[in-house]
Amino acid sequence: MARPRNKADLIVAATENFEKLVKMIEEMSDEEKAKDFDFSGDEKKQEAHWGRDKNVRDVLIHLWEWHKLLLQKKKNNRDLKNVKIQFLEEGYSWKTYGAMNKVFWERNQEVLESDALELVKKSHSEVMELLEGFSEAELFEKDVFDWVGGSVLGSYFVSTTSSHYDWAMKKLKAHKKLVLGK
């Protein structure tokens, strides 16, 4: 699916990708869920996240933490037009956000997979509700919110929803392929 460039396409992509992701998780066997992710034998999977996430819970928690970033920033800055704020957690930049992702992973190791799924379902609904409240112009025209930098607000929603869900599905498919030996 192409990257959404308008509100209607974003809503469809986020909704469809989330539903596919949840279905994929619900259809995973106990064996697939129980076995730790191990992509160390694949030279193509060298990015940090391939080594960081060890199971379905870790993937779900990653999505949930990024939902929280978006929800928190927008709740606190809904009416801010000419103010620059930090989107990422304090102390991190777009060059160092990998370290932030590692912190997300570390602080959620005690969360159960079932709880992680409920957390991400709830936060997805909240993100979609937040998304609905923005106009097409607020989402996809530049210079509406200074805090998004040279980007548009819609790109934050795309990255936090449809694109992130696609990333999660690719990771789960790769794990499933390894477990099943296909």
Residue map of PLM features:
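Short, helix-capping/interhelical loops that line the mouth of catalytic, cofactor-
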Residues: 1-13, 46, 68-119, 177-182
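Alpha-helical transition-metal enzyme core signature, strongest for iron centers
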Residues: 14-21, 25, 56-74, 93-98, ...
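Short N-terminal secondary-structure initiator segments
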Residues: 15, 19-53, 82-98, 173-174, ...
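Acidic interhelical loop/turn segments
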Residues: 29-49, 103-107, 111, 125-158
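Short, intrinsically disordered/low-complexity patches at protein termini
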Residues: 46, 83-85, 93-95, 139-141, ...
